Structure formats: C-alpha cells, structure tokens
C-alpha cells in the first residue's frame, strides 16, 4: 500500500506520518493493512496543491492507494487578509486532490476543521454529521469550500474528518 501525506511539515501531517511509521497511535494500533505502507510525505515546494497540473502529474506518477490531505493555510487571522492564499490552499487544493484521486482510484482522506461550524449549536460544544455548517471566518469559509469540492469531485473514495484544537 502507498500513502501520500500532504502538508507533511505541519503539526498534523508530521504526527500522522510518525504514527503510520510507528504502527501505533494514541487511540490504538494502526490497522494491519497500513502497517507496512510506503508513506510518501510531501509539502511545498515539491507539491503545490493549488496547482492542478502539478497535483495531477504527481498523483499519476506516484499512483497512491490513499492520499491524506493535511495541507492547509491554517493562520486564521491571516486568512482574513490573505483571501487568495487561503482560497488556493483550503479550497482549490482539496479540489485538485479530489479530481486526481478520482482519476486514479485513490482514496482521499481530507482533513478539515471545526471552524466550518459557527459554534452556536449545542452551546458551542459537540458537532456531528447533522450539524449544519455556518463558518464565521474566512478560514472556516475556505475550508468549507474545500469540503464541498471534495464532495463534488471525488465520488467513489473519500473520507472527510474535522479536527478541533491540536495539542
């Protein structure tokens, strides 16, 4: 099995790669079929996920079974002033990965954020699949666009995960 992890230099990408390579996580063992996976960590400048041609070429060349997208523009305040950069990383990037995954048959695991929710439901506590998104920041809005693109372009093999605060 071959797994590409985008955003490998970030906090989440670094931890996912570590756990895949060690074969264990804080919540339990890694599934056996992932134990001996070839893990391909990738980040800027090697792969700019906002560049469709670069993504398409890279994914076709690598032929992964799984793509775990941890890449994002995560500076919440920065997203308010750098709309273009936020849109490229958080919306176009996931779209490009979704299209490439769909073309090659790879499974896409797209990591999003609880910022796609307003925090006003349930007293701002638990969000679940039934919670209606309602971002209140540019960061949340661009991450929600990325989720929508993944849903639109990756029909066969996708999984979306929301993270909260990372420690």
PLM region spans:
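N-terminal Rossmann NAD(P)H-binding glycine-rich loop of SDR-like oxidoreductase domains
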Residues: 1-26
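Structural signature of beta-strand start/N-cap positions in the alpha/beta core
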Residues: 2, 38, 63-65, 107, ...
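SDR active-site strand-loop-helix element
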Residues: 6, 42, 67-71, 108-113, ...
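Intrinsically disordered, low-complexity Ser/Thr- and acidic-rich flexible linkers and loops
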Residues: 24-36
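Rossmann-fold cofactor-recognition segment
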Residues: 38-53
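NAD(P)H-binding glycine-rich loop region in Rossmannoid oxidoreductase-like domains
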Residues: 49-89, 100
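Catalytic helix-loop patch of NAD(P)-dependent Rossmann-fold dehydrogenases
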Residues: 88, 92-96, 103, 107, ...
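Conserved small/polar residues in nucleotide/adenosyl-binding loops
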Residues: 161-167
């Amino acid at each position: 099995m071959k797994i590409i992890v985008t955003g490998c230099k970030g906090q989440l990408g670094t931890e996912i790669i570590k756990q895949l390579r060690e074969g264990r996580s804080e919540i339990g063992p890694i599934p056996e079929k992932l134990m001996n996976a070839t893990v391909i960590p990738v980040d800027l400048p090697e792969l700019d996920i906002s560049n469709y041609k670069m993504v398409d070429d890279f994914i076709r060349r690598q032929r992964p079974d799984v793509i775990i997208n941890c890449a994002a523009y995560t500076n919440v305040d920065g997203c308010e002033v750098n709309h273009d950069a936020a849109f490229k990383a958080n919306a176009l990037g996931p779209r490009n990965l979704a299209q490439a995954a769909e073309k090659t048959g790879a499974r896409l695991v797209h990591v999003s954020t609880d910022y796609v929710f307003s925090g006003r439901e349930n007293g701002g506590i638990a969000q679940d699949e039934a919670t209606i998104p309602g971002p209140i920041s540019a960061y949340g809005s661009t991450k929600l666009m990325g989720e929508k693109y993944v849903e639109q372009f990756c029909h066969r093999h996708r999984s979306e995960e929301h993270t909260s605060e990372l420690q």
